[in-house]
């Protein structure tokens, strides 16, 4: 997707500048916070993404929001640049890519854990410790319940999927039996 490449470039540029101060998390919180405000208001989101409205109007709205939530000059200038370059509509995607870059530098990895039933805290802690040893990075675990798994666990670490669900095991058995017939 063309916008993906553009969003990555803007995220990389902002991240590189943020690296001078080593305030990666602060700038991420400001960027993602502003993105949440935009995403949370459908009218604002449509207004900023609509090319019919002129850039001066968009910039005035962005500046008014910035005044209310107070953020660093660095993030303020970056948001104004996005308005000037007609890229403010890509802010959520830019913030997502920035997070990926930040996690890489800070040696963190986001992990998605899906189970059919709620996990006890001690099991979640054991999974976290095991993944930290395996990856050599600090892990941030998001646990989701998915009753369709029937049992077992599915763990996604970056692009790698570890699927120990009963649903997948039954599907594999079904495929094997289908091939044998």
UniProtKB/Swiss-Prot annotation:
What Pfam families does the annotation carry?
Answer: OSCP
* Annotated GO CC locations: plasma membrane; proton-transporting ATP synthase complex
UniProt-annotated location(s): Cell inner membrane
- Entry's Gene Ontology molecular function annotations: proton-transporting ATP synthase activity, rotational mechanism
- Annotated SUPFAM superfamilies: N-terminal domain of the delta subunit of the F1F0-ATP synthase
Q: Which InterPro entries match?
A: ATP_synth_OSCP/delta_N_sf, ATPase_OSCP/dsu
Does the UniProt entry include the keyword Iron? no
Q: Which UniProt keywords apply?
A: ATP synthesis, Cell inner membrane, Cell membrane, CF(1), Hydrogen ion transport, Ion transport, Membrane, Transport
Membrane topology for this entry?
A: Peripheral membrane protein
Concerning HAMAP family, the annotation shows: ATP_synth_delta_bact
Q: Which NCBIfam families match?
A: ATP_synt_delta, PRK05758.2-2
**Assembly and oligomerization:** F-type ATPases have 2 components, F(1) - the catalytic core - and F(0) - the membrane proton channel. F(1) has five subunits: alpha(3), beta(3), gamma(1), delta(1), epsilon(1). F(0) has three main subunits: a(1), b(2) and c(10-14). The alpha and beta chains form an alternating ring which encloses part of the gamma chain. F(1) is attached to F(0) by a central stalk formed by the gamma and epsilon chains, while a peripheral stalk is formed by the delta and b chains.
The record's comment on protein family reads: Belongs to the ATPase delta chain family.
Instruction: Relate the protein's function as given in its record.
Output: F(1)F(0) ATP synthase produces ATP from ADP in the presence of a proton or sodium gradient. F-type ATPases consist of two structural domains, F(1) containing the extramembraneous catalytic core and F(0) containing the membrane proton channel, linked together by a central stalk and a peripheral stalk. During catalysis, ATP synthesis in the catalytic domain of F(1) is coupled via a rotary mechanism of the central stalk subunits to proton translocation. This protein is part of the stalk that links CF(0) to CF(1). It either transmits conformational changes from CF(0) to CF(1) or is implicated in proton conduction.
User: Under what name is this protein listed?
Assistant: ATP synthase subunit delta
What species is this protein from?
Syntrophus aciditrophicus (strain SB)
Native organism taxonomy: Bacteria, Pseudomonadati, Thermodesulfobacteriota, Syntrophia, Syntrophales
């Amino acid at each position: 997707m063309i916008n993906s490449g553009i969003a990555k470039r803007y995220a990389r540029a902002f991240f590189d500048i943020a690296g001078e101060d080593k305030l990666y998390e602060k700038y991420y919180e400001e960027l993602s916070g502003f993105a949440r405000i935009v995403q949370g208001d459908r009218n604002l989101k449509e207004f900023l993404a609509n090319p019919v409205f002129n850039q001066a109007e968009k910039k005035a709205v962005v500046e008014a929001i910035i005044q209310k939530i107070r953020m660093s000059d660095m993030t303020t200038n970056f948001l104004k640049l996005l308005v000037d370059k007609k890229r403010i509509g890509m802010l959520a995607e830019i913030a997502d890519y920035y997070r990926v870059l930040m996690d890489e530098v800070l040696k963190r990895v986001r992990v998605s854990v899906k189970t059919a039933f709620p996990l006890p805290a001690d099991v979640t802690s054991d999974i976290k410790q095991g993944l930290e040893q395996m990856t050599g990075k600090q892990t941030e675990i998001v646990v989701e319940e998915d009753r369709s798994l029937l049992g077992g666990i599915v763990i996604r670490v970056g692009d790698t999927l570890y699927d120990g669900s009963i649903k997948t095991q039954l599907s594999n058995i079904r495929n094997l039996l289908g091939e044998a017939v």
